[in-house]
């Protein structure tokens, strides 16, 4: 399964959308293994904060733009087909948002594109900082599986 499909499947499993892709209904409580953490959900997250353009545009592509409560870290302009929905989503920062800016939105889930943003030495925060506040974090598997981000390999 490609990374993009893996991420899409995980986000759909979290119940963030009601797209019909031939999948079975999501049942709660739900456990999702992600980059060394087990995330537990008693219900589908009502809102998501994204740290990274890739995760944001993936949610838009899945029809979940209305669930994105804030976004940050953009390297390029949004794709033209997502321009309208993106205009409705608050930009917390063009680069790395502050921990406080993310927490202030009270998200049900934070999705991060890179571990250096939300990870062991995250410039935004560690995953534990969010988890201590009962805010689950989902890290793109392509940035953690088989990779040691502390040494850049």
Predicted regions, residues:
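Extracytoplasmic substrate-binding proteins
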Residues: 28-31, 38, 109, 125-153
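A short, structured surface patch at a secondary-structure boundary
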Residues: 47-120
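Bacterial Sec-exported substrate-binding components of ABC uptake systems
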Residues: 3, 12, 16, 20-57
